[in-house]
Amino acid sequence: MNGAAGGVTQAKMTAPKDQDPWSQDEMLTLIQTMKTLLPSQDNSKFKTTESHLDWNKLAFKNYSGSMCRQKWMEISNEVRKFRTLSELILDAEEHVRHPYKGKKLKKHPEFPKKPLTPYFRFFMEKRAKYAKLHPEMSNLDLTKILSKKYKELPEKKKMKYIQDFQREKLEFERNLARFREEHPDLMQNPKKSDVPEKPKTPQQLWYNHERKVYLKLHADASTKDVKDALGKQWSQLTDKKRLKWIHKALEQRKQYEGIMREYMQKHPELNIAEEGITRSTLTKAERQLKDKFDGRPTKPPPNSYSMYCAELMANMKDVPSTERMVLCSQRWKLLSQKEKDAYNKKCEQRKKDYEVELMRFLESLPEEEQQRVLAEEKMVRSRSGQADKKKAADERAKLPETPKTAEEIWQQSVIGDYLARFKNDRAKALKSMEGTWLNMEKKEKIMWIKKAAEDQKRYERELSDMRATPTPTTAGKKVKFLGEPKKAPMNGYQKFSQELLSNGELNHLPLKERMVEIGSRWHRISPSQKDYYKKLAEDQQRVYRTQFDTWMKGLSSQDRAAYKEQNSNKRKSTAKIQVPVAKPKLVAQSKSDDDDEDDDDDEDEDDDDDEDEDKEDSSEDGDSSESSSDEDSEDGEENEDEEGEEDEDEEEDDDDNESGSSSSSSSSADSSDSDSN
């Protein structure tokens, strides 16, 4: 029997095969940590306390919270959970010696009697009288009547009960102090946890302060009375008063962080998470209020339509919210293109002003707060990167509005009536309109067909105007087309550069130094490695050409014309720009090796900017935004122009695949090859 029991014990204490066995020190560490998490007055059943433990706080080393719990179950299974008579007798002996220790202290015959509150004094005085007057009433009904009578008492009569209470309270406090001196063994407070108290929210700080003030004026008030009196006052406080408590809460949280970090150093075994220390005590509304008073600018509407709706809704407060949106949509559609353009221009100006004000606000903040605001704004680390993205969005917005069909123009004119008929159910309204249009006679459709033809002419006219007089931004900056495949590197050197730039290995270096480092690394690699990168670039070029052909075939005739027009304009502009001009930094250099290396740098800047252009439409914000300086963006635009030519002329792609996208890139690759050889 004993052998079998010993086998069971060993099996329980042994860890499963898929985890490391626990050492004795580790098990003792687990038990010691559990001790620190026990409540100060642990009077519940062990199962109850065990179920309330936060096992994630017990995690340490490679052991998770669930693993710690499993190990505790194994250990506790080996410990008896009943008490012997010997142990019970020890507790009984302690109870006989100190019968009033703990919760029974107030039953001690010498413990001073607590004074009655003013209300209870009134209640005890009047209860017998009212019970005789209303014998049919229950105790509950009598209490309700007397409570109401006490509240209706004039302050002068109430003051009598309050003064009696305060006099007896002072006497009680004196007697309690004497009792503590005479019975120090009974007054020993249980050892409290040394974990620092968590910081309070602004509302909690305000409530504690107001509670003390309220109790001074209403000494007889119960906890419920205080809560009822103060419950709604916080929401009615002015912003200025609420801000006072927000500042106090922030100060308290800062002090808590410092104390808690010292505590963590003294108790590393507790494994306290950093998030628990730095968690904000402010709500979102309180944070916004503080930022507003600190000078944070209000974010403008994201687009011209939202701005129009915001202005319109300010004068439509009596209209239900569902109808407001319908009315906004209808009125927006009735605006002329000139009016819409004016709103668009106004919106863009507000965004520019907002960016300037936000940067000014950020400069006034400490670094920690700057990071928080930047995270909230979803801005990239480099501020100029956002400006580049905004410019690209501007160019997309400047394309002419696509022409509408006859059915779309008709639907736009009658949508309000159909929505009213179907109680704002858009799906039903659209379905009904489609049926009506199909059953409409040709004579009725002629007017809408003519309007559609006029809209088509308008689109072609605006498109031709845009082509004839391209703005500086459209001429110099490429407009992104939806679904356009990302360009592949033109040669081995570009592929090598992209790889180093994308893996983040050189992110600690400034852009110029990054390019120099890439050039020197390219010189150092072997010819076989260069051939490897060259082959990778060729493979990617083949895949890119296939994707590009498929994408071009999927474009509408209008989009294809716009794309070709854009590339032809870029060729004209780059033909004027691409005049060989020596950079100032090259004048003082005489060695050919240094010239080649600078060419490599320029080419890499092109690659880096090209990557930035491609990343502008993605949702991720990365380090590529650092390459948005004026000189680099110009180089990137030239590189894009030349690649755009090759997209249009596939035969040139085949010829230039090995040599590169520009004279600078080919010369850098050739010179670097020759140097390595």
UniProtKB/Swiss-Prot annotation:
<dbReference type="GO" id="GO:0005634">
    <property type="term" value="C:nucleus"/>
</dbReference>
<feature type="region of interest" description="Disordered">
    <location>
        <begin position="376"/>
        <end position="404"/>
    </location>
</feature>
<dbReference type="GO" id="GO:0006360">
    <property type="term" value="P:transcription by RNA polymerase I"/>
</dbReference>
<dbReference type="InterPro" id="IPR051762">
    <property type="entry name" value="UBF1"/>
</dbReference>
<keyword id="KW-0805">Transcription regulation</keyword>
<keyword id="KW-0539">Nucleus</keyword>
<dbReference type="GO" id="GO:0001164">
    <property type="term" value="F:RNA polymerase I core promoter sequence-specific DNA binding"/>
</dbReference>
<dbReference type="InterPro" id="IPR009071">
    <property type="entry name" value="HMG_box_dom"/>
</dbReference>
<feature type="DNA-binding region" description="HMG box 4">
    <location>
        <begin position="400"/>
        <end position="467"/>
    </location>
</feature>
<comment type="function">
    <text>UBF recognizes the ribosomal RNA gene promotor and activates transcription mediated by RNA polymerase I through cooperative interactions with the species-specific factor SL1. It binds specifically to the upstream control element.</text>
</comment>
<feature type="DNA-binding region" description="HMG box 5">
    <location>
        <begin position="486"/>
        <end position="552"/>
    </location>
</feature>
<dbReference type="InterPro" id="IPR036910">
    <property type="entry name" value="HMG_box_dom_sf"/>
</dbReference>
<feature type="compositionally biased region" description="Low complexity">
    <location>
        <begin position="659"/>
        <end position="671"/>
    </location>
</feature>
<feature type="region of interest" description="Disordered">
    <location>
        <begin position="1"/>
        <end position="21"/>
    </location>
</feature>
<comment type="subunit">
    <text>XUBF consists of 2 polypeptides of 82 and 85 kDa, encoded by the same or closely related genes.</text>
</comment>
<dbReference type="GO" id="GO:0001181">
    <property type="term" value="F:RNA polymerase I general transcription initiation factor activity"/>
</dbReference>
<feature type="DNA-binding region" description="HMG box 2">
    <location>
        <begin position="196"/>
        <end position="264"/>
    </location>
</feature>
<feature type="region of interest" description="Disordered">
    <location>
        <begin position="182"/>
        <end position="201"/>
    </location>
</feature>
<feature type="compositionally biased region" description="Basic and acidic residues">
    <location>
        <begin position="182"/>
        <end position="200"/>
    </location>
</feature>
<dbReference type="Pfam" id="PF00505">
    <property type="entry name" value="HMG_box"/>
</dbReference>
<feature type="compositionally biased region" description="Acidic residues">
    <location>
        <begin position="593"/>
        <end position="658"/>
    </location>
</feature>
<keyword id="KW-0010">Activator</keyword>
<feature type="DNA-binding region" description="HMG box 3">
    <location>
        <begin position="298"/>
        <end position="362"/>
    </location>
</feature>
<dbReference type="InterPro" id="IPR001005">
    <property type="entry name" value="SANT/Myb"/>
</dbReference>
<feature type="region of interest" description="Disordered">
    <location>
        <begin position="557"/>
        <end position="677"/>
    </location>
</feature>
<keyword id="KW-0238">DNA-binding</keyword>
<dbReference type="GO" id="GO:0045943">
    <property type="term" value="P:positive regulation of transcription by RNA polymerase I"/>
</dbReference>
<feature type="DNA-binding region" description="HMG box 1">
    <location>
        <begin position="112"/>
        <end position="180"/>
    </location>
</feature>
<keyword id="KW-0677">Repeat</keyword>
<protein>
    <recommendedName>
        <fullName>Nucleolar transcription factor 1-A</fullName>
    </recommendedName>
</protein>
<dbReference type="GO" id="GO:0005730">
    <property type="term" value="C:nucleolus"/>
</dbReference>
<feature type="domain" description="Myb-like">
    <location>
        <begin position="14"/>
        <end position="76"/>
    </location>
</feature>
<dbReference type="Pfam" id="PF14887">
    <property type="entry name" value="HMG_box_5"/>
</dbReference>
<dbReference type="InterPro" id="IPR029215">
    <property type="entry name" value="HMG_box_5"/>
</dbReference>
<keyword id="KW-0804">Transcription</keyword>
<dbReference type="Pfam" id="PF09011">
    <property type="entry name" value="HMG_box_2"/>
</dbReference>
